[in-house]
Amino acid sequence: MVLKCLECDKLLSSIEMAEFHSTKTSHDQFEETEEEIKKRSPEELKQAIEALREKAKEKKEKERILALEEKKTNYKILQKSNDETAQAMRKMQDQARLRDLQKIRQQKAEDAEQRKKILAEIERDKKRRAAERENKNSSVKETAAPIKQPKNANSSSTCTRTPPTSGRFSIRHDGQVCNITIAAEETLRQLAQQVAEKMNVSPPTKFTTTFPRASYGTDVFDKPVNQLDLFPSAVLIPQW
């Protein structure tokens, strides 16, 4: 049986060859024919094989060039993506460093302001204490009366200073200032309770002073404040 492709007039020796031809060319119009398939001479077969080889070679070269172009295109896309990613990473890192720098500057400014306030409070305390001493000395001089003693008699006079009956403490926390006065016999634990009530926080478990640097923990919380070296007044920073 010989089949003829009505679309390209090619003669095919079997149904299988027609199916193969249809797969390669998408031709689907065939009919039986009485024409005979002309047998090729050895030279024609050789030329046909050589032509097929050339076509296969050309096809392979085209595929290689297309693959190379595709590879170049993919590389450019990847390189561009990597450059954009690296640029985005650098931008994010720069922004993070800028935020850290701003935080450091803000913290330094807050520390300087806090130190300024503490120094000012210490200076006010010094002036207040000096004024209290001056007032007490003036009162003693005004109320002291001379005592006459007989001749040749031993005489002595003493002047005692009345210790403070209360302590005045300036509490500094989170930008807030709270002044609290408690009796000399009251304890740091009672002071901590007042800090919690007035500043709306939990009772602190430790107090520190900046000038001079000292800390007072729970081991001294039950001692009267007049037995501690922060009495009669101090600037305290609560801690938890």
Swiss-Prot record:
Keywords: Metal-binding, Zinc, Zinc-finger
Biased composition (Basic and acidic residues): 120-136
Coiled coil: none
Annotated GO MF terms: K48-linked polyubiquitin modification-dependent protein binding; zinc ion binding
Ranges where the record places region Disordered: 21-43, 120-171
Entry-linked Gene3D superfamilies: Phosphatidylinositol 3-kinase Catalytic Subunit, Chain A, domain 1 (3.10.20.90)
GO BP terms, alphabetized: negative regulation of proteasomal ubiquitin-dependent protein catabolic process; negative regulation of protein K48-linked deubiquitination; negative regulation of protein ubiquitination
Zn-finger segments (C2H2-type): 3-27
Entry's Gene Ontology cellular component terms: cytoplasm; cytosol; nucleus
Biased composition (Low complexity): 155-166
InterPro entries in the cross-refs: Ubiquitin-like_domsf
CDD domains xrefs: UBX (cd01767)
PROSITE patterns assigned to the protein according to its UniProt record, in alphabetical order: ZINC_FINGER_C2H2_1
Name under which the protein is recorded: Uncharacterized protein C17C9.11c
Lineage: Eukaryota, Fungi, Dikarya, Ascomycota, Taphrinomycotina
